């Protein structure tokens, strides 16, 4: 996710209510970025970053669409400034993608056989006792 660049105009009304949570998530993101990755697989080093990015976008999504606690102006400000991922939120609004973990899991061009990620397979269609872990973001199943 790009570094937050605040525009010249001040944030809209209600920013002070969500700012502490966003600052806390930013701090977690910095810790995840500087965390040593010795002993981890190459792909595992990015999993905490994907998780925090998901949390931040889900926080803004829930405040606006579920709890209706923030204004449209503040929501659009968060999307414009890169605080939340607008493409991920757009997918969450579509049926079947409500719990999507990251956009890489639905991109078919990155796979050998042109399919979705293993975490997108419903648990009912997997073998009993099989532990699924997404290679991209570490998700254990976001399809339900």
UniProtKB/Swiss-Prot annotation:
Belongs to the BUD31 (G10) family. It is found in: Nucleus. The keyword Nucleus applies. InterPro entries: BUD31 (IPR001748), BUD31/G10-rel_CS (IPR018230). It comes from Branchiostoma belcheri (Amphioxus). The lineage of its organism: Eukaryota, Metazoa, Chordata, Cephalochordata, Leptocardii. One of its GO terms (cellular component) is spliceosomal complex. This is Protein BUD31 homolog. Pfam families: BUD31. Keywords: Nucleus. A motif (Nuclear localization signal) lies at residues 2-10. The keyword Transport does not apply. One of its GO terms (biological process) is mRNA splicing, via spliceosome. Its main location: nucleus.
């Amino acid at each position: 996710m790009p570094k937050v660049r605040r525009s010249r105009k001040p944030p809209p009304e209600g920013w002070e209510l969500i700012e502490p949570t966003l600052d806390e998530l930013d701090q977690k993101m910095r810790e995840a970025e500087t965390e040593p990755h010795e002993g981890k697989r190459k792909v595992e080093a990015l999993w905490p970053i994907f998780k925090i990015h998901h949390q931040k976008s889900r926080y803004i999504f829930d405040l606006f669409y579920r709890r209706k606690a923030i204004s449209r102006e503040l929501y659009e400000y968060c999307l414009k400034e890169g605080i939340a991922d607008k493409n991920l939120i757009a997918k969450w609004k579509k049926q079947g993608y409500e719990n999507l973990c990251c956009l890489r899991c639905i991109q078919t061009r990155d796979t050998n056989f042109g399919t979705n990620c293993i975490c997108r397979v419903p648990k009912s269609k997997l073998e009993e006792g099989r532990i699924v872990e997404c290679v991209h973001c570490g998700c254990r199943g976001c399809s339900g």
